[in-house]
Structure formats: structure tokens, C-alpha cells
Amino acid sequence: MTLFTQEQDGLTEESYKPKKLFTLEEANKTLPLVSRIIGDIVRVSSEMQSLHAEAERLAEEGRSVRAEEVRGRFEDLADQLTELAEELNAIGCVCKDPRVGLVDYPARMHDRVVFLCWKRGEKEIQFWHELQGGFAGRKKVKGALG
């Protein structure tokens, strides 16, 4: 199972079968919980990046015992990250970028499936994008859903 993915090339409505399609209202109602989970994901992801760099530095210095301790902590954090991603998946949304807290919610717009797109720090969902659009293709929700 892919927990986080920024890759959307080739994603089509025929190939993508979400377990739930959200309305804007439904997705916004999940934000208090999703925001807490994403906060943890961003924190754990950041700590993992730091530990990875530290483990490489320690290995280069020949401090293998300490490097193994750091690797062990890294693996614990990876397990936490998996659990957090599974919590999001259970809600029906997916984290697209654990470093900044980018989340997509599958939704139906007119006759097609799209993603409602939320980024950590935003008070509500204000953007959407096509399945293959990604963050760079975000458009304002206001007036688009109907």
C-alpha cells in the first residue's frame, strides 16, 4: 500500500476507485481531526528526515553503534507514520505530501471525480484539482462545485 504519493500521472477515473466521494461540507467537517493527524504526520516526517541525515553522518564517522540506535528510532517513527497514514485512509482522504501536510479528498464535480485539496494551515477547503492536476493545478472551489 502506498501511504503518501505525489505521483498522479496516469491516474484516471477508471483506474481510481475511492472508497468514498466527499461533498465539500463532508470534507470540511473532517478537518479538525485531519488537521491533528496531519500535524503529527508533518512532525514525524520532519523528525525522520533529521534522523536519516544523522544516521548517514554517524555511519560516515564510523560510529556504527550510535548509527544503529538512530536507525532503530527511525524505524519506530516509520511505523508511527504508517499508522497515521492509515488513520487518514480510514477517513477516506490521503496525504499527498507529509512534509507540508497536503491532503486530497476524492469528490464528484459535475460528472467526474476530482480531488478537493487542503493544505495544513488553511481554515477550510478552498481548492480542488483534477485527478492528474496535483497541487500546481489547484483551482478555487467557490462556484466550481454544483
Q: What are the roles of these predicted feature ranges?
A:
Residues 1-57:
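Long, hydrophobic N-terminal alpha-helical segment
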Residues 2, 83-86:
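Metal- and O2-centered redox machinery and metal/ROS homeostasis
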Residues 7-9, 74, 102-104:
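Intrinsically disordered, low-complexity segments enriched in polar/charged residues with Gly/Pro
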Residues 20-23, 30, 37, 63, ...:
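Amphipathic alpha-helical coiled-coil segments and their boundaries
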Residues 50, 54-57, 61-64, 90, ...:
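Heptad-repeat coiled-coil alpha-helices
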Residues 80:
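Phosphate/adenylate-binding "loop-and-lid" substructures adjacent to NTP/NAD/dNTP-binding pockets
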Residues 86, 90-146:
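Glycine-rich, aromatic-bearing surface loops/beta-hairpins
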